[in-house]
Structures are given as structure tokens and as C-alpha cells.
């Protein structure tokens, strides 16, 4: 069995390997399932693991300032957050339509938290995100303009 685990690891099927270990550790739970059903569970676990690893890689690359999630948004304070709008934004339609979001508000109103939460959500949907403060983005564009590489910088992200 160790040889099989080594092969699965070499093939980078670690989710499949771990799910197989789980199935073998709990034979009563999976014993009544047929071969195709068990194989389907193993491949589904591998796909889930890959999606999770991709999302974590995208989140790490985005360099978010905060580890924020939409589920942690505080609607109690008078911040003017519309639950229906946030729910709509969380579905990611604005991403598929290639629309932008501009967050404005007073200092401490939660703009950074909301931006990071929407970015995390987009990463979990498989989108590449990069978190920029406006000042840093403008400085990079200005430097790119001086070096005539602004377009390349923006296309990269």
C-alpha cells in the first residue's frame, strides 16, 4: 500500500491519497459502495483539494492587507452597508461582466475590510486578484509612465 501512496504523491494526487487513507481507515463506512462510487468520491476529494490550494495560492499572491471574509462583515454599525448589494457582489457577476468597484467612505468605515473580503471571495471563485492601496497604484503607474511600461504593468495584473 505504501507503494501506491508514493505513486499518488509522485503524481501530485495528494487529495486522492488522503481520501484513500480515510476510506481504508473506515472500511464499514465505504464497504457497501461500489468501485465507481468510491472512485468518484476519491476524485471529488482531489478536485476539492486542488481548488482549495489554488484559492490559497491566489490569496497569498494578492497580498491582502487583512484576512477578511464577507461572512464577518459587521452590518450593525451605521456604515451604510446594503446586505442585498453585498450578497450580489459576493456572487461575482461583476467579475464576469468585467466591472469595477470603487469603495469610498470616511476613515474607519470599513473600506479596506470590505475590499479584502471581496478580494478573498474572488480568489475563492478562481479569479486572480492583487490588493493595492490607491496611492501605491498611482505611484506604480507614474513610474511605469516614466519608463513607458504602464500598460505592461496593468496588463500583468
Pin down the residues of each PLM region.
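Interdomain "pre-motor" coupling segment immediately N-terminal to P-loop NTPase/helicase cores
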Residues: 5, 9, 13-66
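Short glycine-rich substrate-engagement loop in P-loop NTPases that contacts/grips substrate
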Residues: 79-86, 129-157
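Walker A/P-loop
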Residues: 103-127
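Walker A (P-loop) ATP-phosphate-binding motif of ABC ATPase nucleotide-binding domains
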Residues: 100
